[in-house]
Amino acid sequence: MIKIAVTGGIGSGKSYISHLLENMHIPVYNADNEAKRLTVSDAGIRGELIALLGEEVYKDGLLNKPLLASYLFSDPAHVLQINSIIHPRVRKDFTVWVERQEKCEIVGMESAILYEAGFQDTVDAVIMVYAPVELRIQRAMYRDGASEEQVRARIAAQMDDEEKRRRADFTVVNDGVQLLIPQLNRIVEQLKTEKFR
């Protein structure tokens, strides 16, 4: 089984590329969504967050996002602390998920923070979804109802696209001009070669 990751900045089209891969019968684990799920459902994460932030970190069984956000943004060390609680469990959950996909030749993981979380070590190849920054801003503003300033701040907080591109094995250009399916078909064919087995 070949494990791939799909990553890219906000508004690059990661989820759309993941959707196209799923249409090609390649199941994709969405690490960002699963991290949110595990933050509520995993007893270990819940216990550590309660020990760190108190019972009020969960309200009516749901994560108190404003409280967590205020903690995260008050000190950069807090981000590392929270990530050290959540990311190992996401990694373990991905491993269990992969085992359940035993009949698949290729499986994927979608993660906006693949490199920051160290998830690149769990896959055989990385696909970086690249789009021009102005297009990404427009997409994110439309999708999230965010202001341009908010989107630019989120872009600035993420790893630079060129660094992600340099580290990735493949790049899909999602600029609204280049066709996506032929790019993905070429990548999937390359993945099936000996290099990735």
Model-derived segments and spans:
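ATP-binding Walker
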Residues: S12
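Hydrophobic anchor at the beta1->P-loop junction of P-loop NTPases
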Residues: V6
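ATP-dependent NMP and nucleoside kinases share a basic, alpha-helical "lid"
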Residues: K92-Q101, I106-Y142
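Walker A/P-loop
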Residues: S15
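Small-molecule kinase domains that catalyze NTP-dependent phosphoryl transfer to phosphate-bearing small molecules
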Residues: D121-T122, V133, Y142, A146-Q190
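ATP-dependent small-molecule kinase phosphotransfer cores
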Residues: N33-E105
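P-loop (Walker A) phosphate-binding loop of NTP-binding proteins
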Residues: G9, L21
